[in-house]
Amino acid sequence: MNKVIMAAFAAGTLAFAAPAIGQQLPVRGGNFWEVAEITIDDGHFGDYADHLAGAYRKAEDFARSRGWIKEYHILQNVHKRANEPDLYLVTVSDHVATAAEDEAREKEMNAYLASNPRQQESLSGARAKFRHLGGTMLLQELLYR
């Protein structure tokens, strides 16, 4: 009798376990997209465009050449509504950097730019007079299996 009950229990357990394999989600995690929202004061788009075409591009191209990011984009908000940013700065990477990776990258980037964190902070402060960071988002692309 116990063998019959155990066999029935095992069969029931297997019946519920088998569909779990087929219940895998049809998507998997892909690249990470970091998006920064940028608002620019009226009359200063050219000033910020100069920064994007100069120091920003140089740093992003270096990061891409080192494999830290896969790509980057500058997206303009064409049909901007009230309180929305003018631009979105997007960087795409295959993983989120660890604290140790961030520290090593900062040192390498500063050497490449012949700069240091205090100089970078000062330059950012100068841009903050007309450029405002509204926030950032970290998104992960979902890919079909």
Which residues make up each language-model segment?
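N-terminal signal peptide c-region/cleavage motif recognized by signal peptidases
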Residues: A17-P19
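Hydrophobic pocket/interface hotspot
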Residues: A36, Y48, L89, A99
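Short, solvent-exposed mixed-charge patches
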Residues: Y144-R145
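An amphipathic, aromatic/His-enriched active-site/gating alpha helix that lines ligand/cofactor pockets
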Residues: Q24-V27, K58, F62-K70, E84, ...
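Acidic/histidine-rich, surface-exposed loop or edge segments in extracytoplasmic proteins
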Residues: R28-G43, L87
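Bacterial N-terminal signal peptides that target proteins for export
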Residues: M1-A10
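N-terminal, post-signal-peptide region of Sec/Tat-exported proteins
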Residues: D41-Y88
